[in-house]
Amino acid sequence: MLFRSVPALAEIQLALQSAAASVTGEQADALKRRLRTGTVVTYDDRNWELRFTQERRRINLSRSIAVDMESGTIAAQGYRLRVPYGTLLCVSDKPLHGEIKLPGAANAFYERAVGEHLLIGLATLDSLRRNRHGLHSRKLRSFDEPPFR
């Protein structure tokens, strides 16, 4: 079974935080209550939750803030190839905290949040594009480096 912790890139985190503040109008503590950035765990086994008691320790030791299967695949490959990537998740439940996601509450959340999340994602991309010459990370590589040639 594959278990990977995928760290966030600081440059992306800062652009995301700035865009979220701009779109939501929230600052400081109010924004911190809504926005979490950090390391995400990804698995290659869809049934990892069935072994949660065994997996909980690994998740805690990785200091990850989330477990995600789909965007984790994109992030793992972006990190491996040192290609800039970003994932903005619209989280409507807290399965690791034992809360149940009810259909009505999830639908109401998605109606409110999906448009806002899309605007945050687009604002983040605009910010990164405008400041592309200031982006620097040892985790990134340019498109003229292998394997892109």
Range-by-range predicted roles:
Residues 8-12, 113:
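Short amphipathic alpha-helical segments
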Residues 11-104, 108:
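Active-site-adjacent substrate-binding region
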Residues 95-149:
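His/Asp/Glu-rich mid-to-C-terminal helical/loop segments that flank catalytic regions of hydrolases
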